[in-house]
Design a protein with these regions (language model features):
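Structural signature of tandem-repeat unit edges
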Residues: 39-41, 45-48, 57-74, 85-98, ...
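Consensus positions within tandem repeat domains that build extended binding/scaffold surfaces
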Residues: 78-80, 100-103, 130-133, 152-155, ...
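Sec-dependent signal peptide cleavage junction
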Residues: 18-35
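Sec-dependent N-terminal signal peptides of Gram-positive bacterial secreted proteins and lipoproteins
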Residues: 4-23
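Serine/threonine-rich, low-complexity intrinsically disordered segments
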Residues: 9, 27-28, 127, 139
Length: 190
């Protein structure tokens, strides 16, 4: 009887340990759920659209893809291009509706006077720019189209080369410290 009881206890402990290990593995696989195509790591969202998660290429001039893995790209994820010092010019493809937090931040402007991108072309479909999206970059000008709804805190903080930006009347929410450490880049919408 004692032997049966001991076997039952050991079996129950093994089941509990197995379930704990299994659930831990599930959490790890959710974080590692990124796929890769070309120079981009990405995730497929619940609505079957794609978020670009990480750019692993070395090109200096890029156009973000409209499709990856046969699905439409609608977001540039948080930190996707963070500290990519090789970038000089970026064209964000039509269809992108959101640029995540720190997506293009810290392009190396403080480590090398020639580092960092200076040109970016925004899509007409863009609705949201996340916090610190371009913070600490050498970007010189940005033109946002009508339809943009929000710009997060610190989006252009320490963009010392920024000389011109167009923010349309459609913007309903503007974060704090938007231009702290930047020049006088604001241009009224027309």
């Amino acid at each position: 009887m004692k032997k049966k009881r001991m076997i039952m206890i050991v079996a129950m402990v093994l089941v509990l340990v197995w379930r704990a290990v299994e659930s831990g593995t599930t959490q790890v696989s959710l974080q590692a759920d990124w796929l890769q195509e070309g120079d981009y790591q990405y995730s497929v969202e619940e609505d079957e659209t794609v978020t670009l998660r990480n750019y692993i290429g070395t090109e200096s001039v890029i156009v973000t893809p409209k499709e990856v893995g046969g699905k439409e790209v609608t977001r540039i994820g948080d930190s996707c291009f963070l500290r990519k010092t090789d970038l000089r010019a970026v064209q964000i493809s039509e269809g992108i509706v959101e640029i995540g937090e720190s997506a293009f931040a810290e392009d190396g402007q403080y480590s090398d006077t020639t580092a960092g991108f200076i040109s970016i072309v925004m899509p007409k479909t863009l609705k949201k720019v996340g916090k610190s999206a371009f913070q600490g970059t050498r970007i010189t000008q940005i033109y946002f189209y009508d339809g943009l709804e929000s710009i997060g805190d610190n989006a252009f903080m320490y963009c010392s080369s920024l000389s011109k930006i167009r923010i349309p009347d459609s913007v309903e929410k503007v974060g704090q410290f938007l231009f702290l450490g930047a020049g006088k880049p604001y241009e009224e919408s027309q």
